[in-house]
């Protein structure tokens, strides 16, 4: 059932729980508000896809267990949910995609997420979460997209990680992460790594195991030293942003044929397009304290 983008208002009707055979329900982009009815969480046990995005739903997210044992995709982003991430989500063992981003969720990221072994995509960006990123998230065998940007997460990035599981997209921008970037952070499958606007320090690591990285965003940290020449060997890279760090030295000559992509069309505002479609083909190098050299098409902006 698709009821998206209508003018529905008021609370979600408790009668939703009577639709025991429904498998797909999308009521996004309406004006429903209030909390999820308990009858709804206990009914609808055939649901496979549930989309409740862009509404005004509030209170806690799944504070208790539901009967959504078959659900594969759950989208509850862009609401007004508050409190901790509910333990009711822990029972959704079939989940492949969970999006609870753009809410007012607080507390820490639960360690039990690693029990959702079929989870491919976990999006919790733009909330009020704090504490460290659980190391268990990086060891999940199926997780390919992990989005934790724009929270108040702190602490060091995990060091003792081997390969970072199946991760392809890791988004951690706009947090309070500190320490050095581990050499092991970029597993062999990583395509997008976004660590912008944290408090990371030390040198840019060599990223020895990287094969497929397309987008590497390290802007707005406290990185020092020079650009590692090993980046020259990463031929798949499309976008590199090292702006607003404390780098020095010269730009490797291997970048002489790169063209500047930073700022064209406002890439920061449209980064979701890059991540989704990988359409950008420009290498962005924009930072201070580097030798301003003429190298083919490469432009350096302060």
From Swiss-Prot:
Highest taxon above the source species: Eukaryota
Matches recorded under Gene3D superfamilies: Ribonuclease Inhibitor (3.80.10.10)
Keyword line: Leucine-rich repeat, Receptor, Repeat
Keyword Repeat among UniProt keywords: yes
Pfam annotation, one family: LRR_1
Ranges of the LRR repeats in the UniProt entry: 1-19, 20-43, 45-70, 72-91, 92-115, 116-140, 142-164, 166-188, 190-211, 213-234, 235-258
PANTHER family documented for this protein: RECEPTOR-LIKE PROTEIN 13, RECEPTOR-LIKE PROTEIN 14
UniProt family annotation: Belongs to the RLP family.
Protein's name in the database: Putative receptor-like protein 16
């Amino acid at each position: 059932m698709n009821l998206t983008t209508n003018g529905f208002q008021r609370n979600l009707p408790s009668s939703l729980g009577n639709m025991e055979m429904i498998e797909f329900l999308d009521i996004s982009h309406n004006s429903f508000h209030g909390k999820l009815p308990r009858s709804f969480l206990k009914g609808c046990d055939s649901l496979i896809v549930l989309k409740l995005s862009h509404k005004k739903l509030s209170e806690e997210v799944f504070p208790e267990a539901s009967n959504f044992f078959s659900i594969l995709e759950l989208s509850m982003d862009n609401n007004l949910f508050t409190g901790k991430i509910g333990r009711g989500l822990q029972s959704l063992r079939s989940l492949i995609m969970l999006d609870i981003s753009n809410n007012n969720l607080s507390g820490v990221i639960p360690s039990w997420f690693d029990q959702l072994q079929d989870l491919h995509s976990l999006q919790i960006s733009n909330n009020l979460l704090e504490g460290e990123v659980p190391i268990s998230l990086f060891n999940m065998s199926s997780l390919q997209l992990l989005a934790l940007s724009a929270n108040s997460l702190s602490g060091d990035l995990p060091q003792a990680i081997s390969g970072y599981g199946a991760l392809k997209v890791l988004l951690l921008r706009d947090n309070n992460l500190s320490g050095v970037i581990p050499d092991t952070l970029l597993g062999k499958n990583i395509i997008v790594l976004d660590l912008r606007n944290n408090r990371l320090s030390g040198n840019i690591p060599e990223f020895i195991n990287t094969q497929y990285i397309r987008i590497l965003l390290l802007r707005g940290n406290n990185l020092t030293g020079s650009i590692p020449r090993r980046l020259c060997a990463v031929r798949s890279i499309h976008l590199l942003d090292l702006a607003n760090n404390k780098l020095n030295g010269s730009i490797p000559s291997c970048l002489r044929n790169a063209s500047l992509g930073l700022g064209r069309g406002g890439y920061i505002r449209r980064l979701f397009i890059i991540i989704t479609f990988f359409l950008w083909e420009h290498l962005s190098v924009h930072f201070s304290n580097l030798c301003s050299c003429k190298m083919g098409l490469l432009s350096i902006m302060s």
